[in-house]
Amino acid sequence: MFPRVSAVLPFRPLSRLPLCSAGPEASAATVVPLASPHGTVRTKCNIQRYFGTNSVIYSKKDDKSVPACEISKETENQGSTKENKKKDLVNIIKGMKVELSTVNVQTTKPPNRGQLKSLEAAIRRLQKSPEDAPQKSKSLSPELVAAATAVADSLPFDKQTTKSELLRQLRQHEEDSKAQKDGEKPKISFSNIISDMKVARSSTARASTRPVHQIQFDEGADDFVDREETADLRKRFRKNIFKGKRLNIFELKPVTEEAPETEAAPSLWDVEFAKQLAAVTEQPFQNGFEEMIQWTKEGKLWEFPINNEAGFDDDGSEFHEHIFLDKYLEGFPKQGPIRHFMELVTCGLSKNPYLSVKQKVEHIEWFRNYFNEKQDILKESGINFS
């Protein structure tokens, strides 16, 4: 804070400056401090430069002085305004403290009797739990109790209640395990009860949706009984058309089983006639796909999907019949050049995948007939065929 300018300071009027009786048009007054020498004067500009901090106190005007009485009054007003501001600030702070204290007082009002009772009960439970903990913790192992106490000591809040809660949870686990071990029934949970419940169907809702002229049946609560009744009704009304009494409306003709007609293979003339008929109705190919289809029918292209046995008409013989052909060499000599020749023939036929079993047998029979016709020549050469 700056020092106040005294209003009782002696002033010396100069010839160049007006007195205090000057009007409002006068400029800033000269103020002569006690320690200043005679003849030195501080104008308003000097005061504003060294002492003034607020522009509201003085109004600056060019090269004019203000009376000293006005300066003293304004400085007193400035000091009073600052003191008032301080007082106001202190009052505001005091008011804030009072409001906070009133809020605290309001929050700490005595609760209702019901709340007091609940608090007393909670306090009793908390007081009882640490007392009961050592008695109930006897069933627990000392290692678990020591671990629970270590955990409770490591936490910053209430350690005794934490320890009691941990021990209670451990005891609950032990009780459940004992109950399962002894074969006791598990506790019935609310979810299991809801899952086993059945929804009862009311007949009023359905009856309202039906027309009046329809017959209404009472629906029982048990669906199983309804299912049995409907099953019995179905059995009663189920009839067989062959068990009823005949009405003799239609004439009964004896059913004779006719022998299936054997389909004869088409003759060569029929096949040729079919080819000529197809050639008459055949039109030129419109695209490459039709040409490929025709070539597939003629055997020029493979059939799709690709089959290695396409066009191979077998008589349904097994695989071993194609390979083991030694049984067809009966009647041939068991040794000699003819036997050796026929073994080579059968070996080659067993490796031929293009001939059927019938064709292979016919091939062997042809050699049999050939050697039978040449028996005279074989006897002359000293070879026994039989």
Swiss-Prot record:
Keywords associated with the record: Mitochondrion, Ribonucleoprotein, Ribosomal protein, Transit peptide
Gene Ontology molecular-function annotations: protein domain specific binding; structural constituent of ribosome
A GO term from the CC aspect: nucleolus
Matches recorded under InterPro entries: MRP-S31
Keyword Hydrolase: no
UniProt-annotated location(s): Mitochondrion
Pfam families reported in the protein's UniProt record: MRP-S31
Main localisation: mitochondrion
Subunit structure and binding partners: Component of the mitochondrial ribosome small subunit (28S) which comprises a 12S rRNA and about 30 distinct proteins.
Family as reported in the entry's similarity comment: Belongs to the mitochondrion-specific ribosomal protein mS31 family.
Identification of the protein by name: Small ribosomal subunit protein mS31
Organism: Bos taurus (Bovine)
Gene assigned in the entry: MRPS31
